Curated annotation (Swiss-Prot):
This is Basic phospholipase A2 Ts-G6D49. Pfam families: Phospholip_A2_1. Expressed by the venom gland. GO terms for cellular component: extracellular region. It comes from Trimeresurus stejnegeri (Chinese green tree viper). The active site is at H47, D89. Its cofactor is Ca(2+).
Amino acid sequence: SLLEFGRMIKEETGKNPLSSYISYGCYCGWGGQGEPKDDTDRCCFVHDCCYGKLWGCSPKTDIYFYFRKNGAIVCGRGTWCEKQICECDKAAAICFRENLATYKEEYHSYGKSGCTEKSPKC
């Protein structure tokens, strides 16, 4: 669910997921269109694509379990959907951490009106 995803983001980046990622660029937050603005926004685009492959699952509300082993996120027990949602969220949280150096404040609270280019394919 969004709660676990938020906790993962906080653990991986040290950033508050709501204030830092909820409306970043063209793809972070609800919906998405246009060309991702940078690598962090591309993390969100890939995350949206990952969720899009999970037919019959409810990524925003399905609760899943994860733990850490030697600092790494490990998706734990649960249904197929729960495990797949966890893997999508894990990949995005790691992507955010790997792109912290290029995170741009100018893309925080970015208006979707600036996202008019053709959207890339997943």
